[in-house]
Amino acid sequence: KWCFRVCYRGICYRRCR
């Protein structure tokens, strides 16, 4: 598992997979 930051339309959040 690993996490990375996702930013879209000024909103950033962390996604883990």
Curated annotation (Swiss-Prot):
Keywords: Amidation, Antibiotic, Antimicrobial, Disulfide bond, Secreted
Modified residues (Arginine amide): 17
SS bond partners: 3-16, 7-12
Superkingdom of this protein's organism: Eukaryota
Entry's Gene Ontology cellular component terms: extracellular region
Tissue-by-tissue expression: Hemocytes.
GO biological process, one term: defense response to bacterium
Subcellular location: Secreted
Family (UniProt): Belongs to the tachyplesin/polyphemusin family.
Function description: Significantly inhibits the growth of Gram-negative and Gram-positive bacteria.
Protein name: Tachyplesin-1
